[in-house]
Amino acid sequence: MTNIRKTHPLIKIVNHSFIDLPTPSNISAWWNFGSLLGFCLIIQIVTGLFLAMHYTSDTMTAFSSVTHICRDVNYGWLIRYMHANGASMFFICLFLHVGRGLYYGSYTYLETWNIGVILLFAVMATAFMGYVLPWGQMSFWGATVITNLLSAIPYMGTTLVEWIWGGFSVDKATLTRFFAFHFVLPFIIAALAMIHLLFLHETGSNNPSGLISDSDKIPFHPYFSIKDLLGVLILLLIFMNLVLFTPDLLGDPDNYIPANPLNTPPHIKPEWYFLFAYAILRSIPNKLGGVVALVFSILILMLFPILHMSKQRSMMFRPLSQCFFWILVADLFTLTWIGGQPVEYPFITIGQVASILYFTIILIILPSISLLENKLLKW
């Protein structure tokens, strides 16, 4: 009798994806983030589902319904803070996952990489709409400022913004549709993640050396299933520490003030994971230019396969590229810091320098350094 694991139409798919999957034997902990992202997505969908049972998407009652969840629902405070901080953990894992892909040259798997970038956009859209739902001050003004950016699109901008708002300002119609999209997008993200995995399994995983590893592969289970489980436990430890001890560490105090269209907060800023892009947006004095730079700051990831000039796939044996990769990481930290600062000297100048450096490293320095390293190989 043959093993049901290998013959059953459904179980066979699971088997080829998570059990008998041939995996390079030398993949490091940097390869844990895919499974951690899956885990984060499950946490977000489950907690989100329970929050949706008690939340009302009406401007009059949205803020009160969140208060009700925290005060009156059994473990509502836990569900709410797990959902809010789960988004932060999601983005931490996402940034590390993308960074790993850039460092080790995983972007040469074109389909996997491009679907990954689409996934990043989808998660960012979901997080933005989720931030609007509690209907606090930062929710309202964040939604107003970010959606208003679309008015920079020539000819059709204003019409487009009013169409998204469902009126002449962010109001009940906007909140209702944002709730609807915020509810449905995670399921689309889950479907995209499956496609992402499907394309990855067509080629097999990359590994730290960037070399072909067909001659040295081991089954995913039990080796990497145990390794992933350790990653999940470490993530849970950090996550629950955040949720149970400092749940408001990454949030904005202004969001505990109910939305008031007549009172603008002194500093309007998005959640921390959007600050780098927000800093790039603000560093350009022109509105349309800022919006283009904002979109391109993420879309630039799709150019990496084209900009790859090196004869080696990974940066493991390329010290000069490594140096500039870490300068790029430091630059992203700088942009994140600047995005949370008021628009005044010296922050404006620092933001502009950091924005120029971001695009220069990616578009000019890294490809040039790669060509230099190719020359040094022959030397």
Swiss-Prot record:
Chief place of localization: mitochondrion
Cofactor(s) this protein cannot do without: heme b
GO cellular component: mitochondrial inner membrane; respiratory chain complex III
Cofactor note: Binds 2 heme b groups non-covalently.
Keywords: Electron transport, Heme, Iron, Membrane, Metal-binding, Mitochondrion, Mitochondrion inner membrane, Respiratory chain, Transmembrane, Transmembrane helix, Transport, Ubiquinone
InterPro entries, alphabetized: Cyt_b/b6_C, Cyt_b/b6_C_sf, Cyt_b/b6_N, Cytb/b6-like_sf, Cytochrome_b, Cytochrome_b_C_euk/bac, Cytochrome_b_N_euk/bac, Di-haem_cyt_TM
An annotated Gene Ontology molecular function: metal ion binding
TM helices/strands, residue ranges: 33-53, 77-98, 113-133, 178-198, 226-246, 288-308, 320-340, 347-367
Gene3D superfamilies the record matches: Cytochrome Bc1 Complex, Chain C
Keyword Transmembrane helix (UniProt): yes
Binding site for heme b b562: H83, H182
UniProt membrane topology term: Multi-pass membrane protein
GO process annotations (BP): mitochondrial electron transport, ubiquinol to cytochrome c
Binding site for heme b b566: H97, H196
PANTHER family xrefs: CYTOCHROME B (PTHR19271:SF16)
Function in brief: Component of the ubiquinol-cytochrome c reductase complex (complex III or cytochrome b-c1 complex) that is part of the mitochondrial respiratory chain. The b-c1 complex mediates electron transfer from ubiquinol to cytochrome c. Contributes to the generation of a proton gradient across the mitochondrial membrane that is then used for ATP synthesis.
Family: Belongs to the cytochrome b family.
Protein name: Cytochrome b
Protein species of origin: Hylopetes spadiceus
Record gene name: MT-CYB
